[in-house]
Amino acid sequence: MNFTCRNLSAVIFLFCAVSPAQTNVGWPAYNGGPEANHYSRLDQINRANVHQLKLAWSYDTGEKGGLQSNPLIIGHTLYAYTPSQKVVALDAATGKLKWKFDSGIPGTQPVRGVAYWTDGKQQFIFAGIMNFLYCLDARNGKSIPSFGEGGRIDLRKGLRGDYQHQSIALTTPGIIYKDLIIVGGRNPESHPAPPGDIRAFDVHTGNLRWSFHTIPHPGEPGYESWPPEAWKTAGAANNWAGMALDAPRGIVYVPTGSAVMDFYGADRLGNDLYADTLLALDANTGKRLWHFQGVHHDIWDRDFPAQPALFTVQRDCKHIPALAQITKQSYVYLFNRLTGEPLSPIREFPYPASTVPGEVASLTQPKPDRPEPFARQHLTEDMLTTRTPEAHAWAVKAFRELRSDGQFLPFAVDKQTVVFPGFDGGGEWGGPAIDPT
């Protein structure tokens, strides 16, 4: 999902004026807002006139590499990343550069966005750059020196052991709640990897306010789902896909990924809570309110790949605060987001045991009854290429030498296995879009 590009472009609808009621509608958070539903109430651009869009301006970053940034629009300013993890503020109407922040650290992977905080007087931009979280003045791009150490905190600190030999990167922005920024991080996918603790930092000082262990410590719920020493050695179970927030109720929703190693779990036997889990946490304290594990003992890298989207559903003449979580398997899980009660039944289905020495795959995995998966669930012979008779014959021969029995088929040492949908999904980090109207 990386794209080689240099330009950050904007298209503006040119043939009509913007009404005063719409001039202050922005894009204040990653994927549109804390609800992560990709929704904007702007309606001048629609299916009837979208073909009339023309390029209004283009900003040349002067760089090459993957550009995945979901820009924020705050007032008349656009905030985004360049491919090398520099932060830019542009005039949203003209594309003119207002300021650029260069940390001096060469960024090696795309970052998907920044986070914005204001109390009506101060305005901060929070930017993840490699192992660090920076706090910038949104008006001029200068570091806020009172935050952490000289305007930044080292995200490796406080996780486990010698932090200088660890790696964690905030490639998806944290989420703002009151005077907190709540973050996860992208961890290595092999040993050694730090645990994927969910942490909340004070936006003014950078001090840690709370932490939730996704690999539970002794005495914490879920500890029994790992080997006894896993909290000292196991890694990841991290939130790399972003979070959603019910701000009025003070609940943050955190989907996590698999534990390391992604495709081998003989050193972490058990269901491995809270890997591959949707967590509902009290945003004030980090206390777990409810959870749902989408994959038990993941050995397929079936992370929850995107933020959940928050919305309201009507059932039996009642309005239910709801949540939709997509998966790499193309499932859509629907929950009452206050209680964790499924809005459609979720059943456990049996799957084969692993034949890999030392590995113990879970014999059941969950699946929602509704809605139906949004991508194909099986690869069969009749789907293979028919471009030429020779190509078809080759594909059929190769396919018959593979194991292809559907979802959650454990890998084997003596035969290759088809993974379908592929490792990237299915659903991916863009997440679902919901029109709340």
Task: Explain the meaning of each model-derived region.
Residues W27-N31, G66-S84, T108-L133, Q166-S190, ...:
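Repeat-blade elements of multi-bladed beta-propeller folds
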Residues N7-S19:
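Bacterial N-terminal signal peptides
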Residues E401-T437:
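Glycine-rich, aromatic-lined ligand/substrate-binding cores of catalytic
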Residues Q22-K64, N70-I73, K96:
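Mature N-terminal segment immediately following signal peptide/propeptide cleavage
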Residues A21-Q44, E359-V396, S404:
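N-terminal pre-domain segments of enzymes
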Residues G75, K178, T205, A247-P248, ...:
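Short acidic-glycine loop/turn motifs at beta-strand connectors
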Residues A48-G62, V87-G107, G120, L133-H165, ...:
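Extracytoplasmic/lumenal domain signature
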Residues M1-C5:
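N-terminal secretory signal peptides that target proteins for export/translocation
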